């Protein structure tokens, strides 16, 4: 049996990213790279994983600095070989602000779409020659059909979903696997102060679904699974009704 790949968490403070890393360590991964801004301040996150027996490396990473992505990721792959990359960075943004502050709208789309495209493209280019590695990408139910109530964030996720779906097809047969995760509302730091939407999940529940999908070799997973039917219903909702849909 092949030894599990080292784990790279891009967004090393992400609640979901850390939960996924914990499950991969329990499944046999021995090395975890936590990449985030202020990487010197990841003691708590490191302790969670070392307690499970992992060797943890922290690395400075700014998702918005797309010019640095290639060199950073090439360095990780040079040190560790093929990795299981959990692309867990992102922002929710402020929809009301984004409607009037163009710079804020652009910042949300840059982090949630442009930076993701950059990371995913570089990872694909680095892992293809190795014919190994897995990449976990987080889309959202918000991108299944963009709503008036959160169209800036939703449109970024819609773009990411389309890009990741196409990239997964491009990687077919290469030895590199991409898992596209489509969660609903996740109760965590990013959504503090917000009322949970129906079919909400916790970071741990999302990570359980990710770990199971990876183990099964699946290419996509909805969390919870009932969201797939909801997305189908959303697609045929008349636009005048959809326009009034809440977050």
Where are these regions (language model features)?
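Conserved glycine-rich Rossmann-like NAD(P)H-binding loop of the short-chain dehydrogenase/reductase
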Residues: 29-45
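Residue(s) in the substrate-gating loop at a strand-loop-helix junction
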Residues: 140
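Active-site helix of classical SDR
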Residues: 120, 156
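C-terminal helical subdomain
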Residues: 180, 195-232
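Conserved glycine-rich cofactor-binding loop
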Residues: 13-15
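Conserved mid-core segment of classical short-chain dehydrogenase/reductases
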Residues: 84, 90-106, 149
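Rossmann-fold cofactor-recognition segment
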Residues: 49-67
């Amino acid at each position: 049996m092949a030894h599990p790949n080292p784990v790279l968490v891009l967004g090393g403070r992400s609640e979901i990213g850390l939960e996924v890393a914990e499950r991969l360590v329990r499944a046999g991964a021995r090395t975890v790279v936590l990449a985030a801004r202020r990487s010197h301040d990841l003691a708590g996150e490191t302790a969670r994983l070392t307690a499970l027996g992992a060797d943890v490396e922290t690395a400075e990473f700014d998702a918005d600095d797309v010019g640095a992505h290639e060199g950073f990721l090439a360095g990780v792959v040079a040190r560790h070989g093929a990795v299981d990359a959990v692309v867990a960075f992102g922002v929710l943004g402020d929809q009301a602000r984004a409607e009037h502050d163009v710079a804020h709208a652009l910042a949300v789309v840059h982090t949630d779409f442009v930076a993701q495209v950059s990371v995913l493209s570089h990872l694909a280019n680095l892992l293809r020659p190795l014919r190994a590695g897995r990449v976990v990408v987080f889309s959202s139910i918000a991108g299944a059909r963009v709503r008036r109530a959160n169209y800036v964030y939703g449109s970024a996720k819609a773009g990411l979903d389309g890009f990741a779906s196409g990239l997964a097809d491009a990687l077919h047969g290469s030895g590199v696997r991409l898992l596209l995760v489509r969660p609903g509302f996740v109760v965590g730091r990013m959504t503090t102060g917000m009322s949970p939407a129906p079919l909400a999940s916790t970071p741990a529940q999302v990570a359980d679904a990710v770990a199971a999908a990876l183990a099964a070799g699946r290419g996509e997973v909805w969390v919870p699974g009932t969201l797939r039917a909801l997305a189908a219903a959303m697609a045929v909702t008349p636009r005048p009704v959809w326009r009034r849909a809440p977050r």
